From Swiss-Prot:
The lineage of its organism: Eukaryota, Fungi, Dikarya, Ascomycota, Pezizomycotina. The modification N-acetylalanine is found at residue 2. One of its GO terms (cellular component) is cytosolic small ribosomal subunit. This is Small ribosomal subunit protein eS1. Belongs to the eukaryotic ribosomal protein eS1 family. GO terms for biological process: translation. Residues 1-20 are annotated as: Disordered. The keyword Acetylation applies.
Amino acid sequence: MAVGKNKRLSKGKKGLKKKAQDPFARKDWYGIKAPAPFAIRDVGKTLVNRTTGLKNANDALKGRIVEVSLADLQKDEDHAFRKVKLRVDEVQGKNCLTNFHGLDFTSDKLRSLVRKWQTLIEANVTVQTTDHYLLRLFAIAFTKRRPNQIKKTTYAASSQIRAIRKKMTEIIQREASSCTLQQLTSKLIPEVIGREIEKATQGIYPLQNVHIRKVKLLKAPKFDLGALMALHGESSTDDAGQKVEREFKETVLESV
């Protein structure tokens, strides 16, 4: 018999598995609230690690950007091809108050618009709203056949393209720079600017599928809690108690 250490007997409990911890046990759910221009205010929920020590959950949530379909926000399937970006600016209790951060088209919608025998015209404009939000708006338009046209193609001349692009830029500049971000969002939802461009360019060349395909937020002003609360239909002084006036009654001592 060999003299020495029996390796099998001295084997420790290395093979035992550690107790699995649920990662969601250390997390909390927060509701996301959309701003006033949208019909549906409850967007959904987001996860965040619970506040521990110096790590605050509110700090982790602020600045978080969520992408939502406009169809869900407006309860209308006609807007399904448009995506809205919302940015979390403030956390109130278990609710994240958001503001508009951008707009975009789905790639399948953009691809479906591009067809043969027509001219694609694009324009982009950098504008500043009256409440000092710097935005870049991207517009897209396509030429269409004139009434009673026999020719198959609807190609616009270079001079016509330049004239249409100039008109598009003017309309976007006028519509966006004369309103607040909230008012601009209200214009973007029903495609007001697109219809305005279509109407204004009829004399140059008839257009179809005129859209503001993308809105990019370049710069936001200094954060204002009061403005955000007003956007969500709330007041920053809601938590303050109300002064109650009571009738003064003099206390009479029965015995001294």
